[in-house]
């Protein structure tokens, strides 16, 4: 990637971030349309028990996240040797087709399967795209390179998710998913034109990539991120019902809430990337402290519109700032298994996402109320901080060798 002009680098980074925008939209749009999905795909259950139907519709979020968990390490480990640009293009083809299938399949079970398949390329895309972005930015700016790619995901929550949610409310959720598929098709063109050719790791082998999992620090970083995002998704997955049933606003206010949380995620991601370039572990500890405070604020004030919006902004910011810090930590501790570790981070985050969405649904289905997932988020912060402390203690005893 040497010799690229600054405008070409910016175009390449934009193309990579556009893919993140599409991924953020396809992953998060279900949150704002979860009642629409429940009513259309589970009409009998929705008519008899709306709480149970909404909780079951949450499985669509869980299925996507589990697809990420399965696909990220598998694709990354098997494809580390292939040229990175070509691999990104194939992953975008998979995203486009699976999202179209999500829009067109007729039953809940088939849509559930399509969401699982749509999640398969997620972690591999982000893992490879962040490595490409880090190489384009150069030494000393890795965290910012990672944050630029992830900014596509967070900006999706400011623009893409609210607009697609509004489209889904007006034209139907199936039209919404077709619109998401068009974003992936556009990204394919952008990556093909703007991203420079970059060799894969020709020395990579499956056994070498898997050696990353023999490092305790890799596991600690993965679990720290998973637990942090698990707490976030316990709350975020059910933000739509909170808006309508706790705050007492109409469906039209859901996109507003999504914009606010997206702004928080965007600012948090960029701030977290810069902070990680100075102190990775310090950033992780600060993120957890802010996350606890913001969740407590959400639980106490979400019944008012100002309290809801301020709390969602803070929750999104704290959770999103954690992601580039964890990704940078993995670059430090993964040795020569960079591709797999980068992708495995997104698998771990989505394992946390699926766990958070599931546990949040359990508390709602149990009749504990739509704010009960906040307790799940707070409880998950305890092991998250504990794992980060263990990582620092081990590092002080045995300095990192990468």
Residue ranges of predicted features:
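Helix-breaking motifs and short loop linkers at transmembrane-helix boundaries and internal kinks
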Residues: 83, 104-109, 248, 301-303
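Paired small-residue
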Residues: 94, 98-101, 109-118, 306-314
């Amino acid at each position: 990637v040497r010799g690229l002009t600054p405008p070409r680098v910016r175009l390449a980074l934009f193309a990579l971030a556009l893919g993140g925008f599409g991924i953020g939209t396809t992953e998060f749009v279900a949150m704002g349309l979860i009642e629409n999905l429940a009513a259309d795909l589970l009409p009998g259950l929705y008519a008899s028990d709306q709480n149970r139907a909404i909780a079951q519709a949450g499985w669509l979020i869980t299925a996507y996240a589990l697809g990420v968990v399965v696909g990220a390490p598998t694709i990354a480990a098997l494809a580390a040797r292939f040229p990175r640009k070509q691999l990104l293009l194939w992953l975008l083809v998979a995203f486009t087709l699976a999202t179209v299938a999500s829009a067109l399949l007729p039953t809940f079970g088939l849509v559930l399967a399509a969401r699982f398949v749509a999640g398969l390329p997620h972690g591999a895309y982000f893992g490879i795209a962040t490595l490409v972005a880090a190489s384009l930015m150069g030494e000393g700016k890795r965290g910012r390179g990672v944050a630029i790619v992830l900014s596509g995901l967070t900006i999706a929550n400011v623009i893409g998710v609210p607009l697609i949610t509004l489209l889904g409310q007006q034209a139907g959720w199936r039209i919404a998913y077709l619109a998401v598929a068009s974003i992936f098709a556009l990204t394919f063109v952008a990556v093909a034109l703007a991203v420079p050719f970059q060799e894969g790791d020709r020395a990579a082998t499956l056994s070498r990539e898997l050696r990353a999992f023999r490092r305790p620090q890799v596991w600690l970083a993965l679990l720290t991120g998973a637990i942090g995002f698990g707490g976030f998704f316990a709350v975020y997955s059910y933000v739509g019902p909170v808006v309508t049933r706790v705050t007492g606003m109409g469906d039209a206010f859901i996109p507003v809430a999504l914009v606010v949380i997206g702004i928080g995620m965007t600012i948090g991601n960029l701030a977290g990337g810069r902070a990680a370039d100075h102190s990775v572990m310090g950033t992780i500890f600060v993120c957890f402290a802010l996350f606890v405070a913001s969740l407590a604020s959400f639980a106490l004030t979400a019944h008012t519109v100002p309290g809801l919006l301020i709390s969602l902004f803070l929750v999104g910011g704290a959770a999103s700032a954690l992601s580039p810090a964890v990704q940078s930590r993995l670059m430090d501790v993964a040795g020569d298994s960079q591709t797999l570790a980068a992708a495995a981070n997104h698998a771990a985050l989505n394992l946390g996402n699926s766990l958070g969405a599931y546990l949040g649904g359990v508390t709602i289905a149990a009749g504990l109320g739509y704010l009960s997932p906040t307790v799940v988020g707070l409880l998950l912060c305890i092991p998250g901080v504990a794992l980060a402390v263990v990582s620092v203690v081990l590092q002080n005893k045995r300095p990192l060798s990468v």
